[in-house]
From Swiss-Prot:
Family to which this protein belongs: Belongs to the PIH1 family. Kintoun subfamily.
Organism name: Drosophila erecta
A GO MF term: protein phosphatase 1 binding
Name of the gene: Nop17l
Function of the protein: Required for cytoplasmic pre-assembly of axonemal dyneins, thereby playing a central role in motility in cilia and flagella. Involved in pre-assembly of dynein arm complexes in the cytoplasm before intraflagellar transport loads them for the ciliary compartment.
Phosphoserine carried by residues: S380, S779
Compositionally biased intervals (Basic residues): 611-622
Pfam families from the UniProt entry: PIH1, PIH1_CS
Designated name of the protein: Protein kintoun
Subunit record text: Interacts with Pp1alpha-96A, Pp1-87B, Pp1-13C and flw.
Stored InterPro entries: Kintoun (IPR034727), PIH1/Kintoun_subfamily (IPR050734), PIH1_N (IPR012981), PIH1D1/2/3_CS-like (IPR041442)
Compositionally skewed regions (Acidic residues) per UniProt: 391-400
Length: 845
């Protein structure tokens, strides 16, 4: 039996002073020893016979009546006479019997003519007196525990019940209502049975007490100590009997009864649930099995009922006369209906159904584990992507594109839902916090806020935008899986009345939240702003930095687009070429263009007339014919800069990892490409010394340097050098070129137990992680300040060093055979323009 049923029976027993015997162990031992004596047993049996003797019982009642009469109380003993018995269930779990008995001490039923107020029909209104005895425990035919109640009427009422079915039903309803009202229990009215019994158990008399109408003279004498007690209120007149009103509407009797049931969650002891792992307590709230217990006190076996079990419900149905049950129960978990078990306890009349719960599949559990790991992980500043690996060594052009694609995916703005201002934005039942640290930067008409709150859920970001203010709320999940709610309200200062918010973007990162407020074009750049938890708690904060990129871009574009003046000077004795580069005016450009054709013709005639000597040929083998080809590239770049002045452009200082460098034999016309150390065509025109030194010849090729950065035109790789064939004796030795190698040796060590491709992917993954960590540390709001301060500092340092160590005119640089494009000065466009103003290549031994 369930605990609730036991508590209800105990409560009912206490109300009727029918508690179980409570004795100590010492008293129990003494009684046990006494019953072991034959003399005591004989005396005890004599006492029982004396009590059960009707004559002695009559004498006992007369003595009790006389004693109560002396106290001014009239006592009447009611001896119930058998009538008929009602069998039903008590609270849906215990069998009970109600004895409908009769006694002459009860008043006769009375009736009077009355009209039904609902229908207007005339009829008889009955008043049926009754008496109730205390409940008692008994046993049924199978020696099972049951409860017995007695309801006593006048014998005339029982006689009318036998003759009239309607009066009999009225008598039964009155008895059931009296038991439910007196003992606070629920009876099963749908399964009433009428066994062939006149009375259940042994009849026990009950007592009715009331004050005497004619007290004696002794009773009227005042008590000698009455003056010590407070004055008693005057006694009321003749007490009226308690009248229990009948129900105006009959209690609806259902066709089937819903049995009493309970659902228990069964768990097994699993030691893995007591560990500190993240997935240790995932299934703590999910039981191993469900145990459904259904109380069927009126059924003898399960053959009399039907039971259907599905994955989500249990259905019980019984049509047996006197035991009509119907139950449809929805289960809280999905169960395996084919692996369930059912057992019926005939002693307790209880049906127990055990159903194993279906756990989630391994795939769903793995997905849940990944979700929990994502919520509870600590931010390390590095984000891993399985799809970010790319073989850089094999495809150098794909590295930068892949990294840019990853960055664009990460920094995609979060689509935050926008609420209307009519509905309350912040929930009253949720406690919101203001971010402890935040800063603001202004870039033109964009205000960038950085809210330093880690692990923000992108789906939780909500915003309420107005003309001059914005309200933002979001939530985070900590290591304890408990959400923390934040709110941020920002408003433009009142000084700038024309300022208004045009659009809003909110981005959730691992360590912070970036909020962008795009102001209208008529808005002025604010120097401060108001921020707080809501509109009632605002505080003024200054803006960290203000930047105007558009004005700076115009100045930089003017400097970059300025024309350059390039001069070439040949020294035949030292075989040196002197290049001077400086900004020139438009007049100087026109003069140079007129003089260039004349100088080129004179120079070509001098070279063709003069033949090189043997020493000179040997010296030419060690020299580089680089300077004029590089200068020719610069000359070709001038018309491009002129065309770019006509078109507005916006440049951004982004770090570049690649550049295109030109070899010695670079062809500006995009002709056929020749490989390194290849002889010239036997039937084609052979280049002269002047062509190889002053122009870009046919055999041209391009090479790409991954390590170089910047856009300088002076980073070249030397390739496409022709090799003379032994059979071709007529080829001039002056066209031969040499290659110088760097002294630095690149070395790569591989482990014996790993493959080259495996280490290549590992190194590429490490480089990608460093690149992402660098981009993540510099958020969009702080990166602008960092780039501007860094660029200005580098510019000042280089100007100071250049003014102190180098002349303003021309500087001499020796070609060492090394690529200098990776130098720090090559990262800035300003440094490149100044490097062009002072440059010279000298060829010597």
């Amino acid at each position: 039996m369930s605990a609730s049923a036991t508590r209800s029976r105990n409560k009912q027993s206490k109300l009727r002073d029918d508690e179980r015997l409570d004795i100590s162990k010492d008293e129990f031992n003494r009684i046990q020893e006494a019953f072991g004596q034959e003399e005591f047993r004989k005396l005890f049996f004599d006492y029982v016979e004396e009590i059960q003797d009707p004559e002695n019982r009559k004498i006992y009642e007369e003595e009790i009546t006389q004693l109560e009469k002396e106290r001014g109380v009239e006592v009447r003993f009611i001896h119930p006479k058998p009538g008929f018995v009602i069998k039903t269930a008590l609270d849906g779990e215990l069998k009970c019997f109600i004895n409908i008995a009769g006694s002459e001490e009860i008043e006769r039923p009375k009736n009077e003519v009355a009209t039904d107020p609902s229908s207007g029909n005339r009829g008889l209104s009955w008043s049926i007196p009754m008496a109730q005895t205390s409940s008692r425990d008994d046993c049924d035919a199978k020696n099972n525990h049951c409860k017995v109640f007695d309801v006593v009427f006048h014998p005339d009422a029982l006689h009318l019940a036998k003759r009239n079915k309607q009066f009999r039903q009225c008598l039964i309803d009155t008895a059931l209502d009296a038991v439910e009202r007196e003992y606070k229990v629920s009876l099963d009215r749908a399964n009433l049975k009428f066994p062939k019994l006149d009375y259940k158990g042994i009849p026990r008399p009950t007592v009715i007490r009331k004050l005497a109408d004619n007290p004696t003279a002794e009773e009227q004498e005042p008590h000698p100590l009455a003056h010590m007690f407070p004055t008693q209120p005057p006694a009321p007149g003749k007490p009226e009997p308690r009248v229990l009103p009948l129900k105006t509407k009959p209690t609806p009797v259902p066709e089937f009864t819903v049995p009493r049931y309970s659902i228990k969650h069964s768990h097994d002891v699993d030691l893995s649930e007591y560990t500190d792992e993240l997935d240790a307590k995932l299934h703590v709230t999910v039981p191993r099995a469900l145990v459904v217990e259904i109380e069927l006190p009126l059924l003898r076996s399960t053959a009399e009922c039907q039971l259907d079990v599905t994955s989500k419900s249990v259905y019980l149905f019984s049509e047996r006369q006197g035991a009509k049950y119907r139950l449809k129960l929805d289960l809280p978990f999905t169960v395996d209906d084919k692996a369930g078990q059912a057992r019926f306890d005939t002693d307790l009349r209880r049906l127990s159904i055990t159903l194993p719960v279906v756990r989630k599949s391994s795939k769903e559990q793995a997905q849940m584990h990944e979700t929990l790991r994502h919520f509870s992980r600590e931010d390390s500043g590095v984000e891993l992507h399985s799809n970010s690996e790319s073989p850089v060594e094999e495809d150098p052009d794909g590295e930068l594109s892949d990294s840019k694609a990853d960055i664009s995916d990460i920094s995609s703005p979060t689509a935050a839902p926008v609420r209307h201002s009519n509905s309350p934005f912040l929930k009253s039942s949720v406690h919101y916090q203001l971010p402890s640290k935040f800063d603001c930067n202004v870039l033109d008409n964009v205000m960038a806020f950085v809210l330093h709150v880690p692990n923000v859920q992108p789906d939780s970001i909500e915003q309420l935008r107005e003309q001059r203010s914005l309200h933002l709320q979001f939530a985070t999940i900590g290591s304890g899986y408990y959400p923390t709610h934040y709110a941020f309200y920002v408003e433009l200062p009142a000084e700038h009345e024309d300022s208004a918010i045009e659009s809003v973007e909110a981005e959730a990162w691992d360590n912070n939240v970036v909020l962008k407020l795009c102001l209208t074009s008529q808005s002025e750049t604010p120097a401060s702003y108001l921020a707080g938890l809501d509109a009632t708690e605002l505080k003024e904060y200054p803006v960290h930095g203000q930047y105007n990129v558009k004005s700076k871009e115009k100045v930089i574009a003017r400097k970059e687009n300025a024309p350059f003046e390039i001069k070439f000077e040949h020294n035949q004795e030292g075989q040196a070429l002197k290049v001077s580069i400086r900004p020139g005016t438009k007049e100087e450009e026109k003069e140079n263009q007129d003089q260039e054709p004349e100088i080129d013709q004179q120079h070509q005639q001098q070279v063709q007339n003069k033949k090189p000597g043997k020493k000179q040929r040997k010296r030419n083998k060690k020299e580089r014919s680089l300077s004029e080809s590089a200068c020719a590239d610069m000359i070709l770049q001038e018309p491009l800069t002129k065309n770019s002045e006509l078109q507005p452009k916006s440049t951004f200082n982004l770090p570049q990892r690649k550049q295109r460098s030109y070899s010695e034999c670079n062809d500006s016309t995009g002709g056929s490409h020749r490989g390194i150390l290849k002889r010239f065509s036997r039937y084609g025109p052979r280049p002269s010394m002047s062509d190889s030194c002053s122009s870009i010849d046919d055999c041209s090729s391009y090479s790409c340097s991954v390590d170089a950065s910047g856009t300088s035109l002076f980073s070249h790789s030397f390739g496409g050098i022709p090799e003379e064939d032994r059979s071709d004796a007529g080829l001039s030795e002056s066209c031969k070129k040499t290659v110088r190698f760097n002294d630095h040796i690149m070395k790569q060590v591989f482990r014996l137990d790993s493959s080259i491709l495996g280490q290549r992917k590992k190194n590429q993954k490490r480089r990608d992680l460093k690149l992402r960590a660098q981009h993540r540390r510099l958020s969009e709001g702080d990166s602008v300040d960092y780039e501007e301060s860094r660029g200005s500092a580098l510019k000042q340092q280089e100007n100071q060093s250049r003014n102190c160590n180098k002349p303003k005119g021309v500087s001499v640089l020796h070609d060492s055979g090394l690529d200098l494009t990776g130098a720090p000065g090559a990262h800035s466009n300003n440094n490149e323009s100044e490097a062009k103003n002072a440059m010279m290549f000298e060829m010597d031994d």
